[in-house]
Amino acid sequence: MRAVYIKDLKNEIKKGLITVKGDKAHHLQKVARVKIGENILILDGRGLTVTAKVESHGKRELQVKIIESNVIEPNKPSLDLAFCSPKKNASDEILKIATELGINKIYPIYSDYSSRYPFNQERVEKLLESALIQSNNPFFPKFNE
């Protein structure tokens, strides 16, 4: 089942329908090629998961009807990850895998032998979002720089 991440999902629900707009709708239509009648999974990153059926689609939006919604409790104990920052590509891989494994908080640490480069917060959020969708993880990790 294809998944999509919508940050403010509770605000998007109107009479049992959700409108997926912009790049997310484009991705579902053109890249994932979801069809009318197909089910998708919508995640809000805070434990709310919604299974929805595609009702209609326009140029840059998708109307979906809610079939089922679940609120998942966070894992206890909370899993945190602190890592010394290696090269940039390796850091990206660490962030992706940590998200897929269900890590709640990620802390990059700078030491004498680690790479020192600033993390672009927007880029990190896109990496975490893609890993969240890939793994259907209902919780978006916090990245504390």
What are these model-predicted stretches?
Residues 72-145:
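RNA substrate-binding interface of SAM-dependent RNA methyltransferases
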Residues 1-71, 122:
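N-terminal positively charged helical leader segments and presequences
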